[in-house]
Amino acid sequence: MQSARRALLVATAMWAVGARANLAVPAEVAAGLPGARVQGSAWMRFLGLRVYEARLWTGPTAVPQDWATAPLALEIEYARSLKGTAIAERSLVEMRRQGEIEAATAQRWLAAMKQLFPDVGAGDRLTALNRPQVGLQFFANAVLRGAVDEPDFAQRFLGIWLARQTSEPVLRAALLGGGEAR
């Protein structure tokens, strides 16, 4: 019984790794992060409904726990329609979970995100490409929308999913640990 259970777990893990290995690298990720591979992926759900799938792309030698200083990309593929302003406002709430943000900085970041984040529908993708010690570039369906060249913004924004203070620790573990949360 124990060996059958172990074999099932190994087969499931191998399937998950194979599924991620077959995932095509998005053009914006390939251009900004040569040799990119999926570190992990997970579904974000609200009241049981799928909202989006997040995928963390890292370079071939990346250590995912060093996410704050590593070149990486966070890709979000939406399963439903959301307003860009709502995404921006919720992002700021989540960024504040990591610590206090000065009021003027929060207003500047919110204004930038409202300009960068379009309204999305099912199948639309938003990608944040981390440029360590520079900031983030944002893409919508592989088209560059703009950048926020503030390293603190980059760390706080990526921290929504990757910081210990995230509101979604299971999603974080799946992204950083190379697992897959469905």
Enumerate the language-model features and the residues they cover.
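N-terminal secretory signal peptides and thylakoid transit peptides that target proteins
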Residues: 1-13
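N-terminal signal peptide c-region/cleavage motif recognized by signal peptidases
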Residues: 16-18
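Terminal leader/tail segments of proteins
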Residues: 21-182
